[in-house]
Amino acid sequence: MTDRGTNNDDWYIVDEAECRDDDESELEDLEDTYNSLFNRSESDISDLLDDTQQSQGNSLELFHLQEHLQNEQDLNTLKRKYLNSPPQASATETACNSLSPRLESITISQREKKARKQLFTQNDSGIELSLCQDEVDNINEALQEQVDIVQSLGGGVRDCIGVDILKCSNTRSALLAKFKDTVGVSFTDLTRAYKNNKTCCSYWVIAVWGVTSTSVDVVKTVFQVQCNYMHVEHCLTEKNKFLIVLAGFKAQKSRETVLNLVTSSLNVQSNYIMAEPPKNRSMAAALYWYRRSMSPAVYTWGEMPDWMAQQTLLNHQLASEKHFELSQMVQWAYDNGYTDESDIAYYYAILAEEDENAKAFLASNAQAKYVKDCARMVSHYKRAEMSSMSMSAWIYKRLEEVENGGDWKHIVKFLRFQEVEFISFMIAFKELLSGKPKKNCLVIYGPPNTGKSMFCMSLLRVLKGKVISYVNSKSQFWLQPLASTKIALLDDATKPAWDYIDLFLRNALDGNPICVDLKHKAPQQIKCPPLMITSNINVKADVCWMYLHSRITCFEFKQPFPFDENGQPAFSLTDINWKSFFERFWSQLDLSDQEDEESDGKPQQPLRLATRAASNSI
């Protein structure tokens, strides 16, 4: 150590710290002061610092516990997503539980454990215990109400109510699944679906779930009165009971009627009944019913349906191989008077259940072609037949299709009501039917609502005439109907129509041959048939149509057509009254006697295109 008196101008290097006694004493005094400050019992902040030894603990166990809790939470989330919700209480249980809180704990069957704990099951406040005795007295009454509710579900199903069907949102899907499990065949494979409950059908397939064996005899008794054929089968398994009925009713019934019949007979709800018509054109469905009918466990009554026999029996299979013949279809349309393609197609398709040729027609892929050819051939035959007939023969043929019992006086009274001289009208009408030159057109004019169109239309309807309309005059084919009729009508002719007639149809009014342009054919020369015209214009009073005055015969209707208090016409201009009119004035109209014409060696024989079927022996 250097002396303290060393000169400060030189460098000074400190190698060791110098210790002095006075510094040590100062540190000791400071430590004593610090200890005395924090160790006094009077201090409120004693033991402020925790200087005890610290331990790390088991952090790995804590992490494992947290990870386990997270995994359990994820697993519960997946279970809630993929598993069904807990079963809900049924309507019967809810009704019973609502009677009393204590009644819920009393049941006949075994109860399922609840998911939650029941807390405070016994209240020792004294109030609940005082009410317990009164509620126990009403237990028998509540149980009796519970039994009544169960019995109201139906006698046929109360013994085997399935929880899965009662709780299923789609009852029909559940019934279809149970039907397939019980029978082994899908219900939709045996039936075809009717969306409307009002649609009627003769045959119905009925499947009733949950019917006991005692109710089967009721079905046999009730259905036997209303059915021509009945197939009853009771399918039993460990889980399901199905009653299957194939019923052929005497009259067509809708689904609503069938459901009402079954519910009233078996005392079951309509939710447990499936009713659809059978697939009568399915070979597989027909074979199923045929094979099941041979089982001793199946009750059958009545004759086998035709649709089933045609697809299962051998003789029907051989008969179904018949090919379609167009001549038979044309013969049928000709005999029934069908000339429109839509009518021919519709009514011949309906005939398929009875006629083999119609059945072959439905099985063909060229139905549209056959219908078109049939309509065309019938039109040709009808036109040729009409052309070969005289006016007397045509009227006689048309009147044969009308019933008897008319009164000719209605027509005569109507003509007198319109102030038309009856003798003059009969002369003009006779000349019109005979086609006398210059007398081939009959005009009826007058104010509106006098019955002009009604009078002419009724006559045209009974004679099967045709109408031409001036609205089609821009077409060159608007006169084509004149080539295929015996009498025609131009209704409500206006001034442009009379101008057209004055320019182009003078020779037609004369009754001379005219040339008519036909569609898809060359122009054809025909004799214009008798023509009736209704109009509000008096042609003979106008000089501009002076060349038509000698070619037409006019009658004026002056009075408005009368109606009774019910809105019905006062004069009945019907087909039967026109038939009576022609029969009464047949000779006055110079119509020939058809019986004399047949005796002259010209028998009226209907057209025969195919051999008639031999009549069955009596």
Swiss-Prot record:
Its EC number is 5.6.2.4. ATP binds at G446, P447, P448, N449, T450, G451, K452, S453. Residues 154-321 are annotated as: DNA-binding region. It catalyses: Couples ATP hydrolysis with the unwinding of duplex DNA by translocating in the 3'-5' direction; ATP + H2O = ADP + phosphate + H(+). It is found in: Host nucleus. Pfam families: PPV_E1_C (PF00519), PPV_E1_DBD (PF20450), PPV_E1_N (PF00524). There is a cross-link at K527 (Glycyl lysine isopeptide (Lys-Gly) (interchain with G-Cter in SUMO)). Keywords: ATP-binding, DNA replication, DNA-binding, Early protein, Helicase, Host nucleus, Hydrolase, Isomerase, Isopeptide bond, Nucleotide-binding, Phosphoprotein, Ubl conjugation. Residues 420-570 form the SF3 helicase domain. Residues 593-618 are annotated as: Disordered. SUPFAM superfamilies: Origin of replication-binding domain, RBD-like, P-loop containing nucleoside triphosphate hydrolases. Phosphorylated. The modification Phosphoserine is found at S85, S100. Can form hexamers. Interacts with E2 protein; this interaction increases E1 DNA binding specificity. Interacts with host DNA polymerase subunit POLA2. Interacts with host single stranded DNA-binding protein RPA1. Interacts with host TOP1; this interaction stimulates the enzymatic activity of TOP1. ATP-dependent DNA 3'-5' helicase required for initiation of viral DNA replication. It forms a complex with the viral E2 protein. The E1-E2 complex binds to the replication origin which contains binding sites for both proteins. During the initial step, a dimer of E1 interacts with a dimer of protein E2 leading to a complex that binds the viral origin of replication with high specificity. Then, a second dimer of E1 displaces the E2 dimer in an ATP-dependent manner to form the E1 tetramer. Belongs to the papillomaviridae E1 protein family. This is Replication protein E1. The gene is E1.
